[in-house]
């Protein structure tokens, strides 16, 4: 049994249903892919590793512009495609359809209130049309995104550090690449974005500790004044994004995967690829448990051991970088721009064999080998 029909839940459902297991997926909303606060930027490595996710591509991306608080522009560009921009709602729906084609059963408008692990099964209590219904199965996967209360009820703790995001679809003029905006007056401690999705359309958004909606309205007003968008009248979607992992992501008969587990890049808040990598690990561990009929906490611990081996270094370096950037004021951000441009650090990082759209740790450490930049951070 799987809680959540996002890309994580549907990918695990697809993997297990394809192996012939009976899978039931619960979703509290009435439609799959509703109210997704995500830019839909997915790295090429993710597409190459998971061909099943190659759905709903809107645009290929090989460059991005970064703007300092004063408006200085730093353009990063590669000769090859680095990422794809997808329709996230359509992306989630396509994955769910693939899982259903393999036999997975999807229950919509079904809110999971409780998960109870027993010796011989796991019981899930679901509210559907005002009625509480119990379902029993051999395993449960929590992949319902950030903010679920199920993990605390199961004694797995809660995510300690998180941010808030706000995003809206806007009409644009002549936007052909991703733009990122830095500065305390735009997104304090974080960043804003303008991401093209189709002809004349884009997603504008930002991350912030507090009041992301208010900050986004200010950003939209600025973009309108610059002539980049045609109106500020739009519907704003909000969402929470974890910056740190869940203290524990397993127990007997239960694993937690994706945003619900905090498997997200602390640098950007992106969780599609890391979540899928962990979903792959979870599917393998669950398959082994089903074959051996061993759903003990010890068996489930292999999942946490393996995903941490894969991601811990990236999450630790990324979190350090995130907290360091969050402490900077606009003057310091401007100085970093100046140092990067004067020393051509961005080109050095881009041309390095260590450079990756999805793996930021090596690029961060490489950039810090530059002495003027290292001195800024006391290294």
Regions found by a protein language model. Name each.
Residues 43-94:
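A conserved beta-strand/loop capping segment in the N-terminal third of enzymes
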Residues 287-379:
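C-terminal helical "tail/cap" subdomain of flavin- and related membrane-associated enzymes
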Residues 3, 142-143, 256:
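Redox-cofactor binding/interface segments in oxidoreductases and associated redox assembly factors
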Residues 3-5, 14-37:
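Glycine-rich FAD pyrophosphate-binding loop
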Residues 114, 210-286, 290, 297:
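FAD/FMN-dependent oxidoreductases across multiple families
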Residues 15, 98-233, 262:
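Predominantly flavin-linked oxidoreductase catalytic cores and closely associated redox partners
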Residues 9-10:
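N-terminal Rossmann-fold NAD(P) dinucleotide-binding loop
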Residues 23, 134, 255:
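Hydrophobic "anchor" residues on beta-strands that sit immediately upstream
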């Amino acid at each position: 049994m799987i809680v959540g029909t996002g890309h994580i839940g549907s990918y695990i459902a697809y993997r297990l249903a394809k192996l012939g297991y009976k899978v039931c997926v619960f979703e509290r909303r009435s439609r799959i892919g509703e109210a997704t606060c995500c830019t839909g930027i997915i790295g090429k490595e993710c597409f190459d590793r998971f061909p099943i996710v190659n759905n709903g591509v809107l645009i290929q991306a090989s460059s991005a512009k970064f703007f300092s608080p004063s408006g200085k522009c730093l353009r990063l560009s590669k000769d090859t495609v680095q990422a794809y921009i997808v329709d996230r709602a359509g992306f989630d729906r396509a994955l769910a359809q693939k899982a259903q084609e393999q036999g997975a059963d999807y229950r919509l408008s079904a809110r999971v209130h409780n998960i109870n692990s027993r010796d011989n099964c796991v019981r899930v209590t679901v509210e559907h049309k005002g009625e509480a219904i119990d379902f029993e199965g051999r395993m449960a996967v929590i992949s319902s995104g950030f903010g679920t209360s199920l993990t605390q009820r199961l004694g797995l703790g809660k995510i300690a550090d998180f941010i808030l995001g706000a995003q809206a679809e806007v009409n644009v003029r002549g936007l052909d690449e991703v733009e990122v905006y830095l500065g305390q007056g735009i997104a304090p401690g974080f960043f804003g974005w303008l991401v093209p999705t189709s002809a004349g359309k884009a997603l504008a958004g930002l991350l912030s500790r507090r009041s992301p909606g208010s900050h986004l309205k200010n950003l939209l007003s600025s973009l309108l004044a610059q002539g980049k968008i045609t109106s500020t009248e739009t519907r704003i979607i909000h969402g929470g994004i974890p910056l740190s992992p869940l203290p524990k992501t397993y127990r007997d008969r239960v694993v937690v995967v994706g945003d619900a587990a905090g498997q997200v890049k602390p640098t950007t808040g992106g969780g599609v690829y890391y979540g899928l990598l962990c979903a792959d690990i979870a599917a393998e561990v669950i398959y082994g448990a089903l074959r051996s009929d061993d759903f003990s906490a010890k068996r489930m611990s292999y999942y946490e051991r393996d995903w941490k081996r894969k991601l811990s270094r990236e999450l630790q370096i990324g979190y350090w970088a995130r907290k360091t950037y969050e402490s900077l004021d606009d003057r310091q951000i401007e100085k970093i721009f100046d140092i990067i441009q004067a020393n051509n650090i961005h080109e050095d990082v881009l041309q390095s064999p260590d450079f990756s759209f999805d793996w930021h740790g090596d690029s961060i450490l490489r950039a810090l080998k530059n002495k003027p930049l290292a001195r800024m951070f006391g290294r």
